[in-house]
């Protein structure tokens, strides 16, 4: 580091600390699994340097406590977890952005995995460069698949573990202009009754510098889902989709309309996928949008006491076709109490019958 810090450097550091969730900033002061994501205030796209300092939330007006009665505010993973088993004849799937497996393993990863006992485990942002041995019991999960970032080591990455072996596996996003760069972002498993897609959608980045790239992804994602739908099987699309679809999906919508994950472009892109492929957000379909449904989020920044204050974003989803939602979805929930091994909490889907 240079001995003298320029005003531009200082401004950029402030922006980085206050921006909602910049997934790919190199920050040597943070341990693997930490994040520069922060629920703060609005930022504008950076077109020229130096970056402008975002407006601060007026002192005294920021959130103090969760808006949901009974919301969990623990900042470490509970040492003992008792989670419901899947009903007889049902399959349980869990999806979790672990924000760095090496860190998550030290903070309760296996406590959650053991307690949930899901039939399928979908992980995102594992940040490792090769498969980790004994992460799960291979006798329980005989099928495993790992996807790694093409050009950046220790970045992104997806993995899936399943108690039943799928018929086929398609790594990456075949409809993307550069499919090779997507293998650390998505995998599609074909089962007898459905296609399961485990996905870590790229976000638009600090200052929305990658918003156009994100829009390319959304178009390619829609095309891939349409191709799968044409094959006549159900669709289950899950993962960190890096979008808050509606204002109810984050604590401070009015101050984040220019923040990655809540721009009108990203929300419209997600709406287009749901509408044109005829899919539904299972959690919102189940919970509704009334006051009683507010305050349920899947991501809380490690910074600024966001977890304790209930300042969160709902970025993690299970999306299905409408027929599956109507006839087979039993439960779609956020495991709010399972926080501490990541800045995200797991989301869970239970469906009737086999995959």
What is each model feature region?
Residues 219-315:
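Metal-dependent phosphoesterases centered on the DNase I-like endonuclease/exonuclease/phosphatase
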Residues 126-127, 132-206:
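Structured beta-strand-rich core segments of catalytic domains in phosphoester-bond hydrolases
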Residues 2-139, 145-146, 150-156, 273, ...:
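N-terminal, active-site-proximal structural segment of metallo-dependent hydrolase catalytic domains
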Residues 96-97, 113-132, 196, 225-247, ...:
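Active-site beta-strand/loop signature of hydrolases that rely on acidic residues for catalysis
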Residues 173-178, 201-218, 254-259:
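Surface-exposed cleft-lining segments at the edges of enzyme active sites
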Residues 125, 173-174, 280-292, 332-336:
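Acidic carboxylate-rich catalytic motifs and surrounding loops in phosphoryl-/glycosyl-chemistry enzymes
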Residues 153-169, 306-327:
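Conserved beta strand-loop-helix elements of the APE1-like EEP
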Residues 332-355:
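Surface polyanion/phosphate-binding segment centered on an Asp-His-Pro turn
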């Amino acid at each position: 580091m240079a001995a003298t810090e320029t005003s531009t450097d200082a401004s950029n550091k402030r922006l980085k600390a206050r921006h909602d969730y910049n997934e790919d900033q190199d920050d040597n002061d943070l341990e693997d699994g930490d994040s520069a994501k922060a629920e703060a205030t609005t930022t504008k796209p950076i077109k020229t340097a130096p970056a402008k300092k975002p407006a601060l939330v007026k002192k005294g007006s920021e959130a103090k406590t969760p808006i949901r009665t009974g919301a969990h505010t623990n900042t470490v993973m509970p040492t003992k977890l008792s989670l419901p088993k899947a009903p007889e004849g049902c399959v349980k799937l869990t999806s979790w952005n672990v924000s760095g497996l090496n860190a998550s393993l030290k903070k309760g990863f296996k406590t959650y995995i053991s307690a949930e006992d899901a039939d399928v485990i979908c992980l995102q942002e594992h940040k490792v460069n090769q498969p980790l041995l004994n992460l799960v019991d291979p006798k329980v999960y005989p099928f495993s698949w790992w996807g790694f970032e093409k050009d950046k080591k220790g970045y992104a990455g997806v993995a899936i573990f399943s108690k039943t072996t799928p018929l086929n596996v398609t790594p990456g996003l075949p409809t993307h202009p550069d499919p090779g760069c997507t293998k650390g972002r998505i995998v599609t498993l074909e089962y007898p009754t459905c296609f399961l897609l485990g996905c870590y959608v790229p976000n638009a980045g600090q200052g929305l510098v990658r918003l156009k790239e994100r829009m390319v992804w959304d178009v390619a994602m829609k095309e891939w889902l349409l191709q799968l739908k044409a094959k006549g099987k159900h669709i289950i699309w899950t993962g960190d989709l890096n979008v808050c679809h509606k204002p109810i999906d984050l604590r401070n919508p009015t101050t984040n309309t220019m923040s990655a994950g809540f721009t009108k472009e990203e929300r419209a892109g997600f709406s287009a996928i749901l509408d044109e492929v005829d899919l539904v957000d299972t959690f919102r379909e189940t919970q509704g949008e009334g006051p009683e449904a507010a305050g349920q989020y899947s991501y809380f920044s490690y910074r600024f006491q966001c977890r304790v204050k209930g300042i969160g974003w709902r970025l993690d989803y299970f999306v299905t076709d409408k027929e599956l939602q109507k006839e087979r979805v039993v439960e779609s929930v956020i495991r709010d109490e399972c926080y501490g091994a990541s800045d995200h909490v797991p989301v869970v889907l239970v469906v009737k019958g086999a995959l």
